[in-house]
Amino acid sequence: MFSSYRLARHLQKEAQAQHNNSEFTEEQKKTIGKIATCLELRSAALQSTQSQEEFKLEDLKKLEPILKNILTYNKEFPFDVQPVPLRRILAPGEEENLEFEEDEEEGGAGAGSPDSFPARVPGTLLPRLPSEPGMTLLTIRIEKIGLKDAGQCIDPYITVSVKDLNGIDLTPVQDTPVASRKEDTYVHFNVDIELQKHVEKLTKGAAIFFEFKHYKPKKRFTSTKCFAFMEMDEIKPGPIVIELYKKPTDFKRKKLQLLTKKPLYLHLHQTLHKE
């Protein structure tokens, strides 16, 4: 399951590669994207508690000859899937036009009139580190998160941490202030996070985690609703949207399960500072 997920991620990244940086044609990248989608479906089937799997092992085996002969494959793809990469890097100013369906797993709807959250304690954000010659600092602007029940979240905020492969903190943990507003299926933050370590000093395999938390009045505690993460090879200037995973937060990235099949993401914008 984990290997299927990993392979899917690598294929998704290759499918998104700019033409100049890829050895594949656009048609081949489309096929690679479809294979990645199938791997995600297989991973989801393995994690499903239902007896009937949506994507069987026999189906998975049909992909092997396609992947082995990707440079010469010119037949119709055996499965009706779309090559939609889970991580889509948006061009500056590009707008998303996504239709949101109701999620079967969680009740309630987030659509409604724009609303603002009350002023609260301003989180635990830290200032940018001093610059060093030849070293790169990263600012991540958390713009918004897409959730079907965004309108029902009380006092939502995001905890940001940087972990190594063993889940050990590499920098101080930071909490954003409570979100600035909610609108339709989005919770808006528009807040900058200053990474508390130069990018070049991060260990291999490190990842930046974003845990979305909200208050549950019935249980009287703050709960993690979902999380997302960004790996080191995804540190690039500009916008990026990353997928959301079900809690509990898996800092070791070994048993990941998508929050929903719907097009709901965490929207970020990265700025690199180098002397």
UniProtKB/Swiss-Prot annotation:
Q: Where is this region: Disordered?
A: 97-125
Keywords from the named record:
Developmental protein, Phosphoprotein
Question: Which GO MF terms are attached to this record?
Answer: phosphatidylinositol binding
The chain residues annotated with the modification Phosphoserine are: S113
Q: Which domain of life is it from?
A: Eukaryota
| Record-level GO BP terms | determination of ventral identity; dorsal/ventral pattern formation; negative regulation of JNK cascade; negative regulation of protein-containing complex assembly
Please note every region of biased composition (Acidic residues): 97-107
Which cellular components does GO assign to this protein? membrane
Q: How does it assemble?
A: Interacts with AXIN1.
User: What does this protein's UniProt record list under function?
Assistant: Acts as a ventralizing factor during embryogenesis. Inhibits axin-mediated JNK activation by binding axin and disrupting axin homodimerization. This in turn antagonizes a Wnt/beta-catenin-independent dorsalization pathway activated by AXIN/JNK-signaling.
Q: Which family does it belong to?
A: Belongs to the AIDA family.
Protein name per UniProt: Axin interactor, dorsalization-associated protein
Task: Report the source organism.
Answer: Macaca fascicularis
